[in-house]
Amino acid sequence: MKKKIAYCIPGLYLLGGMERVLTHKANYLAAKTEEYEIYIILTEGHDKELAYKLSPNIHVIQLDINFDDLYVVSPIKKITGYFKKQRTYKQRLEACLNKIKPHITISLLRREINFINKIKDGSIKIGELHINKNNYRDLNNFRIPKFIQKKIASFWMTQLIRQLKCLKHFIVLSEEDKEKWTELDNISVIHNPLPFYPEQTSNCTNKKVIAAGRYEPQKGFDMLIDCWKIVSEKHPDWTLSIYGEGMREELQKQINSLNLQDSCILERAVNNITDKYLESSIFVLSSRFEGFGMVIIEAMACGVPAVSFACPCGPKDIIRDQEDGLLVENGNIEQLAEKICYLIEHDEVRKQMGKQAKNNVQRFMIENIGPQWENLFQELLTNNPRS
């Protein structure tokens, strides 16, 4: 009998890491047509195209809740509208699950986590988190005092943990993050899978450093630009290209003020990021925090060694320090510059680390990550047979 697996995610129209990873995993399972029947249940993007190619074997169900509509209304309407939409979501998701009767329902810990354990459709409920515990709800963009932020975050976390304890299982992306969830014993780690593994490999000879990610404070590009000022003074013939979308104005002002316009370039996000990795010799991750750090394994798959802050969470699970990349004390700009300069100045070390990176990163290929999910599904179904 086929195993029915249902994923709950807001939408699949955004060019985001969570959306791409889910698409990759779902396509892997859907290809096993004799074993799995895959459903993806959405609340947003009813009139938008999917960002990533999805297997025709996958059933996409649009509940048409559209929480996104609340972004353009007054604060009062936001509050009343949210609770109304949340009630509608629960009703429609409950009806949907009772209709399709999945064996396992997976929440990506968005709005449904508040009620999914109450839905009695017979499916096993599990959750997967694509950010780390400490940054599950990032309130830094809200203009409210820090002490109020902490109280709100503490309340949210208490509520979340109560729901997570009711799940049959909970998946996080790194060993480092797992250690933070001391309240839970129904937890394990499954890393994100590589989205690609090209036959080509960077020869690590071009005088190019690359970084990629959204232009927002989390990614720490402000620190990277300060770091590049140090690097460029020693190696003016090298360039840094940062690929992404978002709030670029302040970053460009910073580049201009440091007179780095010729060597530090803010590029638009591109569809052919693989080609950009292959043209580069060093990858840098300057994030303040991560859920995992997909861009690191992408660069490594192209044979490009990474220099990364040892931020929470992900880089320490991915990079084998001094073997296939270099880890730097989190937030230490001077040390980041020093490590980049080290790879610039040591050609053979750089090339060898690139080769080792391409070899070591194979452990994240879908052929290795996919079976971990399948084993989990089988274990859960064996231990929790449907009555």
In which residue ranges do the predicted regions lie?
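Glycosyltransferase donor-sugar binding loop
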Residues: 40-47, 212, 239-251
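Aromatic "clamp/platform" in nucleotide-sugar-dependent glycosyltransferases that forms part
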Residues: 269, 288
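Conserved acidic donor-binding segment of nucleotide-sugar-dependent glycosyltransferases
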Residues: 320-322, 326-333, 342-348, 362
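N-terminal strand-loop element at the rim of the active site
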Residues: 8-15, 28, 32-79, 180, ...
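Membrane-proximal helix-turn-helix segments that form the acceptor-binding/catalytic region
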Residues: 91-98, 147-169
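A conserved mid-protein helix/loop that constitutes part of the nucleotide-sugar donor-binding site
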Residues: 16-24, 207, 211-230, 236, ...
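Carbohydrate-associated surface elements
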Residues: 176, 193
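Short hydrophobic beta-strand element within catalytic cores of glycosyltransferases
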Residues: 305-309
